[in-house]
Amino acid sequence: MNCTNCCSDSTFESIVAYNASGVKHNVVLNDTLSEHSIMAQITKHADQLYLPRPPRWALLHNAFSMSGNAEKPYFDIGVAIPKAVVADLYDEMLPLMSSTLHTLSESLPDFVTFNSSIVDQMQWERVADVELSDGTSEAECNLFALVNEFCCNAILPPIIGAQFTESYQLLATDLAALNSRYWAVALGLPRLSPIPGLPGAALSQKRLIHNFTRMFGELTNPAVRRVPDDDESVSGDETDADVVTPVTKLNKLFTEHDLPLAARASVTLQLVHDIVAEVVPLVFWTLLHVYASSDGSAAKAFEVIPTGKIIAETKPWAPAFQPPSIHPSFPSPPAITFDPTFSELPADLMPYLHSCINESRRLYSCSALTYQLMAPITIYDPNSTVKQDTWILDADSYIDIGLSQSLINSSPAIFPEPKVYRPDRFTTIPYPPSTSPSHPYKSALTLAILTGIFQLWEVAPAPKKSFFDHMNEAREEAQIGAAALSNEQKAAKNVQLKEKREKEGKVGKWVIPKAIDGASVKLPKADVRVRIRRREGLPAGGFGMRRVG
């Protein structure tokens, strides 16, 4: 990256080429944001681009553990698998999004349940180290762990089946572990290499492949269903094989070509990982930056409070409300409903939130996507100040799409103050087009999850604990010993701690963690402790409605 940055600073050309292992690679160094930009022209030639076999196989073999024996059967199927993925998943995003929106409507009110007992917490809370910080109205937790588990719970069941996601409790955790050391695994480095986290990522990879292989065994040879003797109209036990999902459709293709079960697991893991590895970090970074930009003096720089702007612009299509309580002593949790057309809404109806997401993409994208040209293509430079007006990119040469986009995103000539997160940056300028057919689906998922969280929840930074704070907590726990505190005692203790911190002037400050490379979007090097509470002042609504679940 440093070498290409130097080239970008020292040349007037918009496209340069370099030779790697005897292969010519083209890189876009400079571009515009117009509809005739170089990247837009390349996107229009998408039918001339393909992923070459060697890097495709290297990723499948190393990152997704496909056996060498499966190479020939996999490539014998040819383009049928990518076409089936597009047809069965990305072209069918509306019914999939409908299921996801229903899940979000049910789970978003329980994003944080304010239960101190791990038994009563939701699955995503159990991995986020939740602590009550103000009675039962505020909780402190690890944001990335919470977001990762919550997003996987909403995204994956419509794709691979609810039974599998419920039975595989470590699915989200293993996907995150693999993504955190993705490039080390993809390069085939030994698991005992001196890289922190690599042994854990390798173990997660094995566990993922084992469970996906088991799933395909059950899909291909489903167990005989139990039919009750007294009622022949009842079908008995239902499995994922009975529910039509993109994975069950793919399994029919795999079965037709007799692809080994382990190879099916590798292909599906790559598909699932590709979605989660982009959506989860985008949700995390957007939440973090938007809430940080809405805090105190930071909001003055943007003239509007970003969270307020997002809440106002998304409210017509995803209103949050306070349902009536069944009993005064047991208030109902807030609720949210998504408009059925939410996934089809054009970007100009929610420009500010789209801008925030695209700014996260710009700042944290780290894709290494590279295409090979099937035929020569001609590109002209929309910038009239340069010498050369056109380039002919040769057939069989490569275009480094991911590297080019990273260089464009970090160029001060295109984006003023490129290292600064500006929520409104893309409200007036377009974001560079994507060549991926998965882009609309991933964007819709990211948009829906963020909309729900902004509508229902307030997030603030947690005060940083000193060494002495940790020592005091350890001493208090030792004094308590085996005696368990009741919920009331824990709530009272948390209130006392909050009052003590306020008295000492300890206030949380937003700290953006260092970013490290993931598969396609960068990840936080360390998690961020935040405090979450329900958004107050929600309008009354939902009369006559009953919350299911």
For the regions a language model picked out, list residue spans one by one:
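N-terminal membrane-proximal hinge/A-helix region immediately C-terminal to the signal-anchor transmembrane segment
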Residues: 1-80, 92
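Cytochrome P450 heme-thiolate monooxygenase catalytic core
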Residues: 100-282, 298-314
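Conserved cytochrome P450 K-helix E-x-x-R motif and the immediately C-terminal K′/meander segment
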Residues: 312, 316-389, 408
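Conserved cytochrome P450 K-helix/beta-meander segment immediately N-terminal to the heme-binding cysteine loop
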Residues: 395, 401-433
